[in-house]
Amino acid sequence: MDALEEESFALSFSSTSDAEFDAVVGYLEDIIMDDEFQLLQRNFMDKYYLEFEDTEENKLIYTPIFNEYISLVEKYIEEQLLQRIPGFNMAAFTTTLQHHKDEVAGDIFDMLLTFTDFLAFKEMFLDYRAEKEGRGLDLSSGLVVTSLCKSSSLPASQNNLRH
């Protein structure tokens, strides 16, 4: 193979693996947004959110909760992906994900991070608890609604656009 053929082959292989990666991410988005997954995750968090406290110290109870979450949620996602992509390998995808993490939507990457990063997992529970207790972020005070249309209550002379 000459250099041009090798480059062409590399590009072909790269674009195929990129397309496969993009397909998996698309399926992940579908799975995560699905009502069944949302219910599964919400029920799990409802069961344990009161255990989590916003302190530097981590309770011993966090470890079995983390392990249960991984086996429940990761298993569910992997089963769903296997239904869509026969032969799917979660370990291989996780490795590929590290190389493409800047290309994945933040919410999906953050959710996947909860499988491997305990602090991300704990933060997810702390955010959920704050929301349940009414301490979530309230961005409504920063929102201002402005009409893009001129009001018809203005005198006709002010309501007409002049060039």
UniProtKB/Swiss-Prot annotation:
One Pfam family of this chain: ARL2_Bind_BART
Molecular function terms from GO: transcription coactivator activity
Gene3D superfamilies attached to this UniProt entry: ADP-ribosylation factor-like 2-binding protein, domain (1.20.1520.10)
Intracellular or extracellular location(s): Cytoplasm; Mitochondrion intermembrane space; Cytoplasm, Cytoskeleton, Microtubule organizing center, Centrosome; Nucleus
One GO term describing the cellular component: cytosol
Source domain of life: Eukaryota
GO BP annotations listed: maintenance of protein location in nucleus; positive regulation of tyrosine phosphorylation of STAT protein
Main location: cytoplasm
Subunit structure: Interacts with GTP bound ARL2 and ARL3; the complex ARL2-ARL2BP as well as ARL2BP alone, binds to SLC25A4/ANT1. Interaction with ARL2 may be required for cilia basal body localization. Interacts with STAT3; interaction is enhanced with ARL2. Found in a complex with ARL2BP, ARL2 and SLC25A6. Found in a complex with ARL2, ARL2BP and SLC25A4. Interacts with STAT2, STAT3 and STAT4.
Protein function: Together with ARL2, plays a role in the nuclear translocation, retention and transcriptional activity of STAT3. May play a role as an effector of ARL2.
Family: Belongs to the ARL2BP family.
The protein's name in its UniProt record: ADP-ribosylation factor-like protein 2-binding protein
Organism for this UniProt entry: Pongo abelii (Sumatran orangutan)
